[in-house]
Amino acid sequence: MVNLNPKRSDEPVWWGLFGAGGTWFAMLTPVTILVLGILVPLGVIGPESMNYLRVAGFVTSIIGALFVIGSISMPMWHAMHRVHHGMHDLKFHTGTAGKIACYATAALATVLSIVFIFMI
């Protein structure tokens, strides 16, 4: 017998954010760390290219704002999904409260990154 009214899951939404965050973290975060954490301090990229006005101009553009928001929020969604499923794997069955705590943390980081970008 086929169930005509199956229970719908919200898991595809979380898996989508998990996958997008993992992709962002694997592909864009290392380049960002290389440029901002290694090349600029070593002087390979001149300090005049990273002055306040240029960086503020980039961050306040739509592409720059989306990049900064994505760099903060996407890895956070990935990490919180891992924490949620990691707790389950370690037999910490927190149920809905753990799920809400993990995903609310990621949502809070996303909202704060958006708010702080608009404060610049």
UniProtKB/Swiss-Prot annotation:
GO terms for biological process: fumarate metabolic process. Keywords: Cell inner membrane, Cell membrane, Membrane, Transmembrane, Transmembrane helix. The chain crosses the membrane at residues 25-45, 55-75, 100-120. SUPFAM superfamilies: Fumarate reductase respiratory complex transmembrane subunits. It is a multi-pass membrane protein. It is found in: Cell inner membrane. Anchors the catalytic components of the fumarate reductase complex to the cell membrane, binds quinones. This is Fumarate reductase subunit D. The gene is frdD.
